Curated annotation (Swiss-Prot):
Region annotated Disordered, chain positions: 140-161, 311-332
Phylogenetic lineage: Eukaryota, Metazoa, Ecdysozoa, Nematoda, Chromadorea
Highest taxon above the source species: Eukaryota
Full protein name: Uncharacterized protein C30G12.1
Originating species: Caenorhabditis elegans
Cited SUPFAM superfamilies: Pepsin inhibitor-3
InterPro entries the UniProt entry points to: Pepsin-I3_sf, Protease_Inhibitor_I33
PANTHER family in alphabetical order: PROTEIN CBG07421-RELATED (PTHR37969), PROTEIN CBG13131 (PTHR37969:SF3)
Length: 453
């Protein structure tokens, strides 16, 4: 009786283990692209890297790409019928560069099912539609990405150089045109293409806690009087001596505008007057008029390279009720003493973030400004950028787009189609069905296939 139970229980356990085990896919499972391709001087067959090619083989592959492009051009014209298909390189092993789909245990290429190098059968019409749908979804995702990139306006966080210039303009009050000219390498860093905490830094002026911290900071420039401001409406940035040192002035305000006594503490360069309300009472009527608020912009000088020690000391404020005549040469002396308006604490945070490839959150900025000491306030740090090291140019290295008779720009090595959406941000799935591959094409003849192993 016990032995008979073994005959019934053991097969059930074996079937349960077989059903619960995940399918073992071949290395190139989910690959959509040419059967033979060269990427970064590496030979790929069915999406799997095989070996590095030597210089002679790379030269042969480059010649093949050139001849293939010439064959396409000649075959599209009506007056040329003598063009022949170029010879496929020998290292491709007889595979052409036509697009294929690698499934769980077979490969679909040219509307036929292959297991290894053996031709099994042609596809049915229904299976052809499934394979064509996989290719169309892949092409649709790429074309949709390119079309949206051309037509749509750039969102915040998608243009690194512009966003970094705006961040410097908000935090350090630096002209955006200067940062765009002297910091073009920032666009090569993926750090500033992110959204989130960087965008929160643009709204520092709206936070009450941050206003108090910035108000307590001693790195507030002394504003010169408005009376004798030189007029320089146009800034020629080509005449700047140092690429990291910018000196410029803005337009001269009108003489009728008088600076207000009370100023907002979070904006050290712009004085914004409150609306003035004048009430005139007559015998029968009362008239109320509201003046438009005015904004007075004062000149500033900026230095990103060094921060002189003299700028960290506070100068006594002049009485604003005095006329400019009672203060001769006050404008020139204060303008020459104020050279930088950059807080070293902010520079230090940005420098550390660039070195560690991290982002600055609002909490760390508040904590750094609240815990300032003598060492941090007297030792400034300049901005430091991590430049990506470009690879050495290789004349034999082909581009990422592999030429061929089919859509070879879909080729991405080591990127299976099932995990492409989550691992590669360049492509986006048009719908959830993109993850499903027609693996039943291989399972139809899997048991009866003599070449399956």
């Amino acid at each position: 009786m016990v032995k008979s139970l073994h005959y019934f229980i053991l097969p059930l356990i074996g079937n349960a283990l077989i059903l619960n085990t995940p399918p073992e896919y071949q290395p190139g499972y989910g690959y959509v692209g040419p059967a033979c391709a060269v990427f970064d001087s590496t030979l790929f067959l069915h999406g799997v890297s095989k070996r590095k090619l030597n210089d002679h083989e790379l030269h042969i592959f480059s010649s093949y790409q050139h001849d293939l492009s010439a064959f396409k051009d000649s075959s599209s014209s009506f007056d040329s019928f003598e063009a022949s298909f170029p010879t496929i390189p020998k290292f491709c092993g007889g595979y052409d560069d036509s697009i294929e789909v690698v499934l769980d245990s077979c490969i679909v290429r040219n509307n036929h099912v292959y297991v290894g190098d053996h031709l099994i059968r042609p596809l049915t019409n229904f299976e052809k539609q499934k394979i064509q749908l996989v290719k169309m979804r892949r092409m649709y995702g790429e074309s949709k990405r390119k079309r949206s990139k051309r037509s749509s306006k750039p969102l915040p966080g998608t243009r690194p150089q512009r966003d970094f210039s705006e961040m410097l303009h908000k935090l350090l009050n630096i002209n955006s045109t200067v940062t765009s000219r002297f910091l073009p390498v920032v666009s090569q860093s993926p750090l500033f293409a992110m959204e989130g905490p960087w965008q929160n830094l643009f709204e520092l002026g709206k936070d009450k806690d941050m206003i108090e911290l910035l108000a307590a900071s001693q790195f507030k420039p002394q504003l010169p009087p408005v009376a004798s401001v030189p007029v320089a409406p146009v800034i020629d940035i080509t005449k700047i001596d140092s690429p990291y040192r910018a000196t410029f002035t803005t337009m001269k305000p009108r003489k009728s505008q008088k600076p207000e006594k009370k100023k907002e503490v979070f904006n050290v360069f712009t004085t914004k007057t409150n609306p003035q309300i004048t009430t005139t009472t007559m015998t029968t009527t009362t008239r109320t008029s509201t003046a438009i608020p005015t904004t007075t912009t004062t000149p500033r000088q900026i230095s990103l390279q060094t921060i002189p020690f003299s700028t960290t000391t506070r100068q006594p404020n002049f009485d604003k009720t005095k006329t400019p005549a009672t203060m001769p040469s006050a404008s020139s002396s204060s303008l020459s003493s104020i050279q930088t308006v950059v807080d070293p604490i902010i520079l230090k945070l940005i420098s550390k973030a660039l070195e560690k490839n991290e982002m600055i959150d609002e909490y760390s900025l508040k904590q750094a400004l609240s815990m300032r000491n003598v060492a941090t306030t007297t030792t400034p740090l300049p901005l430091r950028f991590i430049l990506p090291t470009p690879a050495a140019p290789n004349p034999f290295l082909p581009s990422t787009r592999v030429g061929g008779l089919s859509h070879n720009h879909l080729f991405i090595p080591h990127q299976p189609f099932t995990t492409l959406v989550s691992t590669d941000s360049r492509y986006s799935a048009p719908n959830p069905l993109s993850h499903r591959l027609p693996n039943e094409i291989c399972r139809v003849h899997m048991n009866s296939n003599p070449f399956h192993f």
